[in-house]
């Protein structure tokens, strides 16, 4: 199973809590996390794009770096790990994104890929006068379908004359083209989003669900398998999960309860209001899950809480779900969490025995000792 890190491009990572670690994003912080991940053989890092936060006492996501420029910097200081930036498609024309991606492909020597998002939080775009109106919720994947076709044409042949409802290319050129096949990620959860991923993406992200229920996301993975049967393409699932680990299950659970007790209710309320704005996409969108009050303290991503051994076992169970190629991990404390993953969790994972790391897998160590 592949493992990626969802690096903290926004303040406080993914915990809306006064009791969680409080920090601002910086290049140095993300460089430290990425270099640690690379050292332990983690496969990739991905940064989101967020143009306006949720406020509240913790000023959640009010402080953010920009995804492409951050990943360009990380490309220059890494050698092996793959890097994915996120394009806010509403405000970044596809021809410009194609060129930026090709540039980071050059910096990284072919280690770059792209995460495409449609945009769901109206204030991110209305603050710039660039929100197209709430009807966009119902047409956003048609828009993104044209967007990615322009990207693929420019990356593939260096020229596009694409004509659609949203984009009109007139002998648009791109050179140099990427040296590596440019992989594209989407996070489609609704029927329209899943159909888009099955047609155009290489990987589809979905949210994990619940606390210590590692296979609860399986219906989303099966839904993607069904969608790709219609398109005849190979697209795999990656699952977003938060890891809260410690020496014992009890210590990890105490941290989780402490974070929940400090929930930033003002920021959570803002998230709920923004999630309710989309009345056109159905009840199964990612933002609907994010805003659910059940575990909004970490935007309802699946959460693994336990000892290092418990978390390793739960991650291995996730790898057993058909169609699942990997996980995208967040941590309560990224600096400590990524190091603990490499030192204490990954060596216990049966699904990671192939990884080249300074800390060998327990299974490999036992094999060599036999």
From Swiss-Prot:
CDD domains reported for this sequence: Alkanesulfonate_monoxygenase
Binding site for FMN: 49-50, 115, 124, 140-141, 190
Substrates-to-products reaction catalysed: uracil + FMNH2 + NADH + O2 = (Z)-3-ureidoacrylate + FMN + NAD(+) + H2O + H(+); thymine + FMNH2 + NADH + O2 = (Z)-2-methylureidoacrylate + FMN + NAD(+) + H2O + H(+)
Keywords: Flavoprotein, FMN, Monooxygenase, NADP, Oxidoreductase
GO biological process, alphabetically ordered: alkanesulfonate catabolic process; nitrogen utilization; uracil catabolic process
One annotated GO molecular function: uracil oxygenase activity
Pfam (any one): Bac_luciferase
Documented EC number(s): 1.14.99.46
InterPro entries in the cross-refs: Luciferase-like_dom, Luciferase-like_sf, Pyrimidine_monooxygenase_RutA, SsuD_RutA_monooxygenase
UniProt KW Nucleus keyword: no
Entry function: The FMN-N(5)-oxide reacts spontaneously with NADH to produce FMN. Requires the flavin reductase RutF to regenerate FMN in vivo.
Family, as annotated: Belongs to the NtaA/SnaA/DszA monooxygenase family. RutA subfamily.
Full protein name: Pyrimidine monooxygenase RutA
Species annotation: Variovorax paradoxus (strain S110)
Lineage summary: Bacteria, Pseudomonadati, Pseudomonadota, Betaproteobacteria, Burkholderiales
Gene name of the encoded protein: rutA
């Amino acid at each position: 199973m592949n493992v990626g890190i969802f690096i903290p491009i926004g303040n406080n990572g993914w915990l809306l809590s006064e009791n969680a670690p409080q920090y601002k994003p910086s290049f140095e912080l993300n460089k430290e996390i990425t270099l640690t991940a690379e050292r332990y053989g983690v496969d990739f890092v991905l940064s989101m794009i967020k143009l306006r936060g949720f406020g509240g006492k913790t000023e959640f996501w009010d402080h953010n770096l920009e995804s492409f420029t951050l990943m360009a910097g990380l490309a220059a200081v890494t050698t092996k790990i793959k890097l994915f930036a996120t394009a806010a498609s509403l405000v970044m024309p596809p021809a410009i994104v194609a060129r930026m991606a090709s540039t980071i492909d050059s910096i990284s020597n072919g280690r770059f890929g792209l995460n495409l998002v449609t945009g769901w939080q109206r204030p991110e775009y209305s603050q710039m006068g660039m929100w197209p109106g709430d009807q966009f919720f119902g047409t956003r994947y048609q828009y993104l379908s044209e967007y990615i076709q322009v990207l693929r044409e420019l990356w593939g042949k260096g020229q596009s004359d694409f004509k659609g409802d949203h984009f009109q290319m007139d002998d648009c050129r791109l050179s140099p083209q990427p040296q590596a096949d440019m992989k594209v990620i989407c996070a489609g959860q609704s029927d329209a989003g899943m159909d888009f991923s099955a047609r155009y993406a290489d990987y589809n992200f979905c949210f994990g669900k619940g606390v210590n229920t590692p296979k609860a996301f399986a219906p989303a993975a099966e839904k993607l398998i069904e969608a790709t049967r219609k398109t005849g393409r190979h697209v795999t699932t990656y699952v977003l999960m938060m890891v809260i680990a410690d020496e014992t299950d009890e210590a990890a659970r105490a941290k989780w309860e402490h974070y929940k007790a400090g929930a930033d209710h003002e920021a959570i309320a803002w998230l709920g209001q923004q999630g309710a704005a989309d009345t056109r996409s159905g009840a199964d969108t990612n933002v609907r899950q994010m805003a659910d009050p059940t575990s909004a303290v970490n935007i309802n991503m699946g959460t693994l809480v336990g000892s290092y051994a418990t978390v390793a076992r739960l991650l291995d169970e996730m790898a057993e779900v058909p169609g699942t190629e990997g996980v995208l991990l967040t941590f309560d404390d990224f600096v400590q969490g990524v190091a603990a993953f490499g030192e204490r969790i990954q060596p216990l994972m049966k699904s990671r025995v192939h990884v080249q790391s300074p800390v060998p897998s327990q299974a490999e160590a036992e094999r060599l000792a036999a």
